UniProtKB/Swiss-Prot annotation:
Matching InterPro entries: Alkaline_phosphatase_core_sf, DeoB, Metalloenzyme, Phosphopentomutase_DeoB_cap_sf
Protein task: Isomerase that catalyzes the conversion of deoxy-ribose 1-phosphate (dRib-1-P) and ribose 1-phosphate (Rib-1-P) to deoxy-ribose 5-phosphate (dRib-5-P) and ribose 5-phosphate (Rib-5-P), respectively.
Cofactor binding mode and count: Binds 2 manganese ions.
GO molecular function: magnesium ion binding; manganese ion binding; phosphopentomutase activity
Pfam families: Metalloenzyme
Protein name per its UniProtKB record: Phosphopentomutase
The gene coding this protein: deoB
Cofactor(s) of this protein: Mn(2+)
EC number, UniProt record: 5.4.2.7
PANTHER family referenced in this protein's UniProt entry, alphabetically: PHOSPHOPENTOMUTASE (PTHR21110:SF0)
Gene source species: Buchnera aphidicola subsp. Baizongia pistaciae (strain Bp)
Catalytic activity: 2-deoxy-alpha-D-ribose 1-phosphate = 2-deoxy-D-ribose 5-phosphate; alpha-D-ribose 1-phosphate = D-ribose 5-phosphate
UniProt-annotated binding residues for Mn(2+) 1: 10, 348-349
Localisation: Cytoplasm
Similarity annotation: Belongs to the phosphopentomutase family.
Length: 408
């Protein structure tokens, strides 16, 4: 019986890529800098303190690939010689450092074209597009239309939105258009329908914005605004066939998507999508789906909180806390991996919480492989995340993917 479990620790980069200078990210190192701040006692909030303690991830080879990736030692990390997994680290060949690019490349469909972006920090979405959306969606207008972080935009426009019911539109250096609306006053269903309509408008005009993101929030005063777990991403469809589509098409297999995975691939190559938000719920859902998984199944999960709650908000303590929680609970998952099963833990980009700004960082990612029948081996540097997709294709005896080289 062949089952694969693909876990993405969203934004868990391990050092700048060779082209990081193009992004202003030379020196970025999500894992390394979190470890450094913990070592310096600069990450002692949320009830955690001191050195970063993640022994189970280290037992899969994390420290070894992190040092190889960055060329620097890890402060406060005591590595182990008792490595039970195999390991590698990978460069990204996609043009961007965004969620869609990283995930599509993992699945064997790197983004070698340029996304469209709303690069102007003010009046970001052009007037003609705003008018299109307003007319077709029967709106009175938008608030914002600028570059902003999710928390800042609510501080600035949340109360005005409540009184006017005008959606809040904002973007960033990523290929995204984000729409924030109050979950009850504007309505969750109405927000989703608005984002679907924007997706259709952009697609019709051949505007390659990767994701339209619905960002519902609650609260009635600035100090009480909170984004909820009901975020939805309305993505473009992958431009190339993914390994998940091959598994379904060639083996009549199943792909169980947990959390935001289905949204990232616009539902393509997904058999079943399991709704879950928050680190604990995502982990528990993953455990349950692994227990239920049959032959020729991929269980695919993204742990988004590392990125959305801690990376973008530049919160080192929160990132460290959740890494330690994940590591503490990882043995529960490892014991469910049968002899023929394949577990891969990786990331889609970096988001160094010690870095300037609030955006992703262009970084290499770890590829931690656990298979009971495999002896521990260092598979070294990989040129593309698509080596993961090619490895899965070989594992399931599928036809060869267009990109990537099987890791083993």
């Amino acid at each position: 019986m062949k089952r694969a479990f693909l876990i993405v620790l969203d934004s868990f980069g391990i050092g700048a890529t060779k082209d990081a200078h193009r992004f202003g990210d030379v020196g970025a190192n999500t894992f390394g800098n979190i470890a450094k701040f913990c070592f310096l006692n600069k990450a002692n909030n949320y009830g955690r303190k001191g050195l970063l303690y993640i022994p189970h991830l280290l037992s899969l080879g994390l420290a070894k690939v992190a040092i190889a990736s960055s060329g620097q030692d890890l402060l406060g990390i005591q590595d182990t010689n008792n490595v039970i997994g195999s390991y590698a680290y990978s460069n990204e060949i996609s043009s961007g450092k965004d969620t869609s690019s990283g995930h599509w490349e993992i699945a064997g469909a790197p983004v070698l074209f340029d996304w469209d972006y709303f690069s102007s920090s003010l009046n970001s979405v052009p007037k003609y597009l705003i008018q299109d959306i307003v007319d077709q969606c029967n709106l009175s207008g938008f608030l914002g239309n600028c570059h902003a972080s999710g928390t800042d935009i609510l501080d600035r426009f949340g109360e005005i939105h409540i009184s006017t019911k005008k959606p809040i539109l904002y973007t960033s250096i990523d290929s995204v258009c984000q729409i924030a609306c109050h979950e009850s006053i504007f309505g969750l269903k109405r927000l989703y329908n608005l984002c679907r309509s924007i997706r259709k408008i952009f697609d019709k005009r051949k505007i390659n914005i990767a994701r339209i993101i619905a960002r519902p929030f609650t609260g009635f005063k600035k100090e009480h605004f909170r984004r909820t777990g009901n975020r939805r991403d309305f993505s473009m469809e992958p431009h190339k066939i993914t390994v998940m589509e091959k598994l379904i098409g060639e083996k009549k297999g199943r792909v169980i998507a947990i959390g935001k995975i289905s949204d990232i691939y616009a539902g393509k190559g997904i058999s079943c999508s399991m709704y879950a938000t928050g680190l604990v719920n995502l982990f528990n859902t993953t455990i349950q789906e692994i227990k239920n998984a049959k032959n020729n199944t991929i269980v695919f999960v993204n742990f988004v909180d590392f990125d959305s709650l801690w990376g973008h908000r530049r919160d080192v303590s929160g990132y460290a806390k959740d890494l330690e929680w994940f590591d503490y609970n990882l043995p529960k998952l490892l014991k469910l991996v049968h002899n023929e099963d394949l577990l891969i833990i990786t990331a889609d980009h970096g988001c160094d919480p010690t870095w300037i700004g609030t955006d992703h960082t262009r970084e290499n990612v770890p590829i931690l492989i656990y298979q009971r029948s495999m002896e521990s081996k260092n598979f070294g540097y990989r040129e593309t995340f698509s080596d993961i997709g090619q490895t899965l294709a070989k594992y399931f005896n599928l036809s060869t993917m267009s990109y990537g080289t099987s890791i083993f």
